[in-house]
Amino acid sequence: MGSSLRSFAPGDRAAVLELSRHALQKPQEQVGNPLWTTAEELESELSDWEVPPEETLLVDEIDGEVVGFAGVEVSPGFDHADLFGPLVAPSHRGQKIGTVLLEAAIERAENRSARRIVGAIGSRNATGRLLLERAGFAPSGSATAVFRLNEANHRRVETGPAELTVRPGTPDDLHATMRLYRECFPDGSFPESAWLAGLGQGAVYIGEAKGESRAMVNIDTADRWIYHLGVTADERDRGIGAYVLSEALAGYWSHHPGETLGLSVEADNLPALRLYRRQGFAPMLVLQAFELPL
C-alpha cells in the first residue's frame, strides 16, 4: 500500500468534495473549513483565491485514491492563514494521516509568512479538537453558530426605518466603511485593502440616513458568505440591521439568483440569532475556533 502526500490538483476536486460532504453529515467530524456541499460551491470559492489553492492545499493519496485533505488559505494583506481540514476518509483513519496533513498545512502557512493559523472544529468533534491541541492550537473565543439561507426561503423585511436607504457601496465609501468597521468590530482583522476590493466589486452594502453611513454588511461573492453586519451604536435596536441585511440579500440575489449563502454568529448572541431565524436562516452546525501562533 503506497501513501503519498502531495499538493492539491484540479483533478482532486471530486474526491475532496466527497470528504467535505461526509464530514458535514457527521457532527463528530465537522470542521469550520471546508463547508462545500456542491461542486459549484467548491469551484466558486477556490477560483477566487489570490494564492492558488494548488500552492497551499494538500491531499494524501493511497494507491491512487485521495483519502485525506488539508491546507490553508493565505490572502495578501491578512496576517493569518485559514485552516482547511484535516479531513480523512473513514476507511483510512488510525494511520496518523490527519496528523501528517495538519503538520504539512502548518508548514505551508509558515512558508507564506503567516503569523498565526485560525481554524475551527465542530463542537462535537472530539478527535479533531485533540488533533489541533496536540499541534499547539488553543481555543479562541466562544462557540459560533453557522447558518445557511437560500433565496427561496428568505423572509424579506418589507419596511425599514424612516429615511434609511440601502445601496451597494463604492470605493468612495472606504473612509465611512472603515469607521463603521472599527466601531462595530474592534478586534477585526480585515485589512483596508480587502474592504476597498469589496467596495469595488459592489459586495459591501451601505445603510444610509441623512447622508451618513449608519450600517453595513459584506457579502463575499466567491465564498458565498455574509460578513460584518454592523450598525453604529446610536442606531441599534431600531431594526436597521435586519433591514440592511434583507435589502442586501435581495440585491445580491438579483445578480446571483438561486445561490445559498452562509454566515456565522456567536452562539450566545440571542438578538442576532433571532434576527437571522426571522429572515429564514437555517442552523447548520456549531463551531469552536482555535488559533496557533507561528
Predicted regions and their residues:
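Conserved catalytic-core motifs of GNAT/GCN5-like acyltransferases
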Residues: A120-G122, A138-A152, S264, A282-L294
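A short beta-loop-alpha structural element at the N-terminal edge
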Residues: S4-E18, L164-T177
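Conserved beta-strand-loop-alpha-helix junction that forms the acyl-donor binding cleft
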Residues: P90-R93, G119-R129, A233, G262-L273, ...
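A short helix-loop-beta-strand connector motif used in the catalytic cores of GNAT acetyltransferases and
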Residues: S44-V59, G68, D82, L196-I206, ...
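Conserved GNAT acetyl-CoA-binding A-motif
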Residues: A109-S123, Y252-S264
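Conserved active-site alpha-helix within GNAT-family acetyltransferase domains
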Residues: Q95, T99, S123-G141, A242-Y243, ...
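Conserved acetyl-CoA-binding loop-helix of GNAT-fold acetyltransferases
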Residues: V88, G94-E107, R134, V231, ...
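Conserved GNAT-fold acetyl-CoA-binding loop/helix
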Residues: L24-L46, M178-Q201
